[in-house]
Each structure stands twice: as C-alpha cells, then as structure tokens.
Amino acid sequence: MRHTFQSFWIGDRISPYEALCMRSFIDHGHGFALYCYNSRLKVPRGVELRDASTILPKDQCFAYSTGFGAGSFSACSNLFRYLLLQRFGGWWVDTDVLCLTHCIPIYYSFFAREDDDFINGAVLYFEPGDRLIEECLRDALNLGRNVVWGQIGPRLITQKVQELNRGWEAQPASTCYPVHWSAALDLVDPRKTAEVASSTANSMMLHLWNEIFRQAAISKKCLPPRGSYLRMLADRHPVAGWRGLYLLNDGSDVCMPSALTKVRLPARDRVKCIAGTLLSNRLRPLRTSTAGDRHIMQVSNN
C-alpha cells in the first residue's frame, strides 16, 4: 500500500545520502514530504517540500552542545517529530532511513525496537493526539535544550512505552533496524554484503545510523565502495551530487575495517585514513573509464 512519509531537514542542502534515502521511498511508490526552512532546497523529484516553520519556528532550533553528537540537530529533530505527530499524525522517518519495499502494511501505531534495551524513534506512525506522543512532547518541552544524546529520543520513547504498558505494540528490530548501530559500518564493507542482505531480507526499511557515519568521518559525498550493500542500493536508486568514490591506493575498492585513524596532513585537506585509504570531502575523480566506475582519486586543494 502507498503511504506518505514525513521528515525534517535543517540546512540549505542535503547530501547524496539523504537524497538516496528519499529517492528510495519515491521509487517504491510512496509519497515523501520533507519539512524544511528553505523553499528552494534541492531534493529528488517527487519529494514534496513543506514549511517547517508551521511546526517549529526556525529560531527555536537547537543542536547538542556537548558530548556524543555535539553539533547534531538530532535533539531538535526529536522535538519536531513529536510536535508534528501530535498535531497531524502519520508516518515519520529520519532522513537516514532507506525504504526497502513498496509493501508496507497499515498500522494503528508503529514503533520498533532497535535492540533488547531500546525503542528507536527513526521510524514512527501514530494517529493525531496519541497519548504516547503527547507525553513524549510534554517531557521534551519540559527538558528544554539542556539534554544529552538520546535523552529525548530512544530513551524517552522507551520510557513512555514502558510507563503506558505498550511494549506489546513494539515491532521487532528486523522491521527497520536489521543492522544494529554497532555494526553500522558493515553497510559499506563489501565483505559484509551477504550478511547484511540476509539481515534485511524481510525488512521494510533500513536505518543508516547517520551519527555513527559522522563520528567515523565517512563522507556522505563519496559513493560507498563497490560491492557493499549500501553501494548496491545507491546504484538501484541513483541520485546526483556524488563527488567521489572510496578506493584503495592500488585502485581496488576498499573494505572498511572497524578502526579509523587520522593522517597528519595539511589542515586544508582534512584527509582521513582507513587502512591505507585516503578519504576526504575534497576527493575528486581524475579519470573515469567507460567500464564501470574505476575512478582514480586525488586530494583536491581547490
């Protein structure tokens, strides 16, 4: 069945990762409405832009100031979804959620576990005025801006689900969180593709865990390595804006390990190193052959 999914964006541009996620919903026949403060924001064809200020004035947006996630607008996004769902109801998805199927059932409410401990809020469905959302909104407003990562997100939703004895409604992690956040980099590791494909075989959606990618300094402007699960989806739902491709120095595609270390290079390059692979927001292709995507990359000082 066709559904319309709602989300929220702060900023003047989206990366190819967000575009890929939105495009996946459109390609599966669903609607996608993005609330933002820029009416000229470039988004994939078929995405409907809506005025976010009708839900939350821009001057009330805020980011985490300290700790894990510092600089992220995730807390503001949590508040926004509670305001939106309390008022209008419907589907909510974060901008780092991929749609994997056109076949999504009708729910009277939807929330799913990310693991045995927490309910995640990246994918939600509620009718307007649902008590669970009203209580999340009330507590989020009372806590204000001085919150830490997850405090008004998964932790708050989990707390309210328990207090209202609604744990029986929680869907299994396999519906939307088949890849746990601790294994997020498996999505861009060609060695893990079969394992990820098996985990997602019966999933409706896939959460990409954007903050894990951000903490690992994975550029969202570079195509994932060829052969990885995320690259397979990027090829299936093509979008514009990719500025590079992750490759090994010998020209072969990179297998992403779990460890990330910095390379001491000029500050203007901001280059990271993963197992001998130079990665950067400033990578650009020097040459592209007609066979596949064998780009040779260099650091651009422009």
Where in this protein do the model-derived segments appear?
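Small-residue hinge/turn detector
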Residues: 78-89
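Glycosyltransferase-associated regions of secretory-pathway enzymes
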Residues: 1-77, 95-302
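Short aromatic-hydrophobic micro-motifs that form the base-stacking/packing surface
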Residues: 91-93
